[in-house]
């Protein structure tokens, strides 16, 4: 019997395994690891410690581990993609099983090989994507993305001269990390307010963003603000490319922004009744602390806002992936068909 609970514990006949804690430790120990790869690492570790005696028990452990991860982690879009692809990989490997113990060892070893290949995706993406960065061009990117950084750093190493606008990317402020990464590589950068994107767009030659997930119709799920970049880019006739590893292709088909599964209610109106006392909340630190700190949103207000948005495929010029630069409208569905059929 295999069980799991909301605390992140997978319970099976051989004991307990805190898969959410293991997943978080992988992310903490390796800043370069992506969420789906960390999820696959945690699942491989779960399977390697299991003493399952049958295929059914083995698959139950894997299924419960995946479900526990999805339920125990907020913003689990890319994590879910990694779990689903790894489950499909394991299912395919179970055909024509002879000796189960030998098969189990083979699966764990192949799982580790799967991780190695997933980790190598970013290098291939950088190699495929850097030719899009032309000499003398100006790039606009949104916050921090390891994939986007890899493409830009690959271009810089080949002595391509370019400049980068980086959005601050509130509320995370991850644009600060991207700016620091690019400056360390001697790439000229300028951080811009999220609200200044439309003002900046006419000076831009190419928009390059990352993705938390790429959905079935080729649309993107990414940090909030990505869609507005895409809208402004399309209006200004600027190419808009997204960088994403193929293990971020996710079996979802959101029809609107509200189809993204958030872990809590968002955009709730507060209670303006005179009976309700609203104490003045403490402002939280942000990159804008030096300017009118008393006017920034507090933590409660930030939590009431979405962290992700959906960019429809018609706004995406192409996807830079480890499988090549593919058309967002047809390429993703074709690759998902190959994976799941």
UniProtKB/Swiss-Prot annotation:
Where does this protein chiefly localize?
A: cytoplasm
Metal-binding among the record's keywords? no
- How changing residue 222 to Y affects the protein? Decreases the amount of gcn3 in the eIF2B complex
Q: Name one GO molecular function term.
A: guanyl-nucleotide exchange factor activity
Judging by the UniProt lineage, the source's domain of life is Eukaryota
In its UniProt record, which GO terms are filed under biological process?
Answer: cytoplasmic translational initiation; negative regulation of TORC1 signaling; translational initiation
Q: Which GO terms describe its cellular component?
A: cytosol; eukaryotic translation initiation factor 2B complex
Location in the cell:
Cytoplasm, Cytosol
Keyword annotations from UniProtKB, A to Z = Cytoplasm, Initiation factor, Protein biosynthesis
Transferase keyword on record:
no
- Chain's role: Acts as a component of the translation initiation factor 2B (eIF2B) complex, which catalyzes the exchange of GDP for GTP on the eukaryotic initiation factor 2 (eIF2) complex gamma subunit. Its guanine nucleotide exchange factor activity is repressed when bound to eIF2 complex phosphorylated on the alpha subunit, thereby limiting the amount of methionyl-initiator methionine tRNA available to the ribosome and consequently global translation is repressed.
Question: What family does the Swiss-Prot or TrEMBL record give for this protein?
Answer: Belongs to the eIF-2B alpha/beta/delta subunits family.
Q: How does it assemble?
A: Component of the translation initiation factor 2B (eIF2B) complex which is a heterodecamer of two sets of five different subunits: alpha, beta, gamma, delta and epsilon. Subunits alpha, beta and delta comprise a regulatory subcomplex and subunits epsilon and gamma comprise a catalytic subcomplex. Within the complex, the hexameric regulatory complex resides at the center, with the two heterodimeric catalytic subcomplexes bound on opposite sides.
Q: What is this protein called?
A: Translation initiation factor eIF2B subunit alpha
* Native species: Schizosaccharomyces pombe (strain 972 / ATCC 24843)
